[in-house]
Amino acid sequence: MRQQLQQQLGSRISFTAMVMKAMIPALRRYPYFNASIDDANNEIVEHGEINIGFATHTDAGLMVPVIKQADHKSLADISAEIDTLAEQARQRKIDLADLKGGTITLSNVGSHGKHDRVGRPIVNHPEAAIIAMTRIKPMPAVVNGEVVAQQTLDMVTSYDHRLIDGVYAALFMETLIEIIEEPGLLLGYG
């Protein structure tokens, strides 16, 4: 799937970028995932922009650079910006402005370690939700009555129950998974 997109786009595409791009239409459909609570004014703020933070491990600890206006960027642009910001964070040369303004966070714990056991991530306040993905791995699946090895990606979400109820979260994740399972759709969302 990724190789197909890379061929079509003519550039390297990360799995994190693919999931981030898939999040955009799901966030538009379920906008409370892209909202926050303004505690001072006791109100819900629905953000017009989709600014997706991505958790980045550095020697100095966790940093969360933000892809601002991700909904206005191509898949190739998102992937390139993730690479640039992650490298700046690891070198401790990232601008503070690039660590602010996120409306939701994506954590790719699958890029580290050989095990994919992961707890529930903590929401990055004041955001309403965080999505965590594990590594892609072959798992048994039944296809046309046959058991075959199929690449799978596990994902979990944590969310602020003051904004998002369980059914809304399940529908959001279902939509996100449907988009990821049809990678050709990623090119059509912007």
Whereabouts are the PLM-identified features?
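C-terminal catalytic/motor cores of large multi-domain enzyme assemblies
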Residues: 1-190
